[in-house]
Amino acid sequence: MLTLLTNKTYEKERIVYKCGQNNLKTKPQLLTNYIPIDKNNKNAYNKRKLDSDGFHDFSIYIDYTNINLEITRYRLTKYKSLFINGFNRVISTLESLLKVKTLNYAYTISNRQIQELGIYNWDTKLFGDSAAKRGYNTDSLGLDLIIFGKFLSSSELGESTLAAAAAEYVDVDTQQPVFGIVYLNKDVDYSLINSKEYFESIILHEFTHILGFDINYFLYFNYILIQNDKFGIQRYYINSPRVVNVAKNILIAIILLVLN
């Protein structure tokens, strides 16, 4: 079970949620024709292609179209800022982190992970070409990863599950995720989540699934979140041996800066 630690400053009792990753049964599609071309630089793909020891500027974009509609549909409007601001702050954190010199394994999704990590439903054609491919793969957007938000019920995600996420489409040449979905549980009582740090730590964890980090290092929240009681407030940042070896100081500085 994936345990979520709460901020004691905001909540008197500990709330425990699961990550619904194991409930996602399907797999992503390998894109053989995906070439992210920058509007002003047609050679951008060559710069973005991952090398074993090269620099890599990673650009992330969230399509809020669907999640905005569902926030209204499921009467979650009063929590909209929690969702939107949480996603945006996590993206800024990841983009800052991923501009440092990285190792190839941080983004490479193995064949095993492709089978286990994915969520695209070939039978129901969930989202299908109309949503996941609406120009993203051929237009000159100059983006590396597009993330799509969606709400599911507890019966679909699992009881006590707060969120789940995975890559939908993966570039066949680089094994780089190019489109992913974050699922949020529409049945959760979000009034219990009073801390933005609390929610952002969840989204940060889910984004690691889309990026394809080794599942062994991101299985439990309390494995990847280190508590810092400075000034009497609990704060969290990613702590993975594979990430820390590359960007420990930058990572800590970025996360703590964002959460201040």
Where are the model-predicted features located?
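Extracellular zinc-dependent metalloprotease catalytic-domain scaffold
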Residues: M1-L204, I210-N260
